[in-house]
């Protein structure tokens, strides 16, 4: 890949909670049998970025705003669900190897990662709360019912810090967004944790798997 001054790339991965098995229960009387079939539903979401070009963005300069709108959408056949998202920032070279960013002899990698994280949060849409575990939780359940919300945009753009300079020349930064979902109905009382403003800040005792 031809090196550019500054290159921005994004990888988005969607992980979802699952329920996807079918069971058959038979009930018998003295004279006849009755068979009731109960089929479980599923929780399934997609994650895409309609405003971000598939080929990525190149020749980025400090203070440039990049359109980036991670959008979580409930599948049309999915049960209602709560969603959360994680954002991870990394700096890599042209071969995808992790880089350390130095300025004036000081390692500023974590500082610069935090700056990009803050840039994402600066355009975060309403309804999201940063949880105690680093995830961002959407406080409205997604549903395909009439007049319901079936998608949520995490944030709308990222602005590269104006103070950055030659220390990031020929560097790519990657913003990985991961989305997860959990069924909204019939959860145990202790699964969702709320803050003092009644915003979701954690899913306790939940193992997330991909729904195929």
Language-model segments: residues:
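A surface/secretory-pathway sequence property marking extracellular, secreted
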Residues: 41, 92-135
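Generic short beta-strand segments
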Residues: 50, 88-90, 157-161
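Beta-strand-rich interaction surfaces with strong enrichment in secreted/lumenal proteins
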Residues: 55-58, 134-146
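Beta-sheet-dominated interaction scaffolds and their linkers
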Residues: 45-67
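Gram-positive cell-envelope targeting signals
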Residues: 1-49, 70
């Amino acid at each position: 890949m031809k090196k550019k001054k500054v290159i921005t790339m994004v990888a988005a991965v969607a992980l979802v909670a699952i329920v996807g098995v079918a069971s058959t229960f038979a009930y018998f009387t003295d004279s006849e049998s009755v068979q009731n079939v109960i089929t479980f539903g599923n929780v399934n979401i997609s994650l895409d970025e309609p405003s971000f070009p598939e080929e990525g963005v190149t020749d980025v300069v400090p203070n440039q705003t990049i359109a980036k709108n991670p959008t979580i959408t409930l599948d049309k056949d999915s049960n209602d669900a709560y969603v959360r998202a994680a954002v991870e920032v990394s700096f890599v070279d042209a071969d995808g190897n992790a880089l350390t960013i130095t300025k004036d002899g000081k390692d500023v990698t974590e500082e610069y990662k935090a700056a990009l994280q803050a840039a994402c949060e600066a355009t975060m849409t309403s309804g999201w709360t940063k949880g105690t575990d680093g995830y961002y939780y959407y406080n409205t359940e997604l549903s395909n019912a009439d007049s319901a919300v079936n998608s949520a945009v995490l944030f709308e753009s990222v602005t590269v810090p104006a103070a950055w300079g030659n220390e990031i020349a020929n560097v790519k930064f990657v913003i990985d967004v991961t989305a997860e979902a959990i069924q909204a109905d019939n959860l145990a009382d202790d699964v969702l944790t709320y803050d003092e403003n009644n915003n979701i800040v954690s899913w306790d005792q939940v193992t997330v798997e991909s729904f195929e």
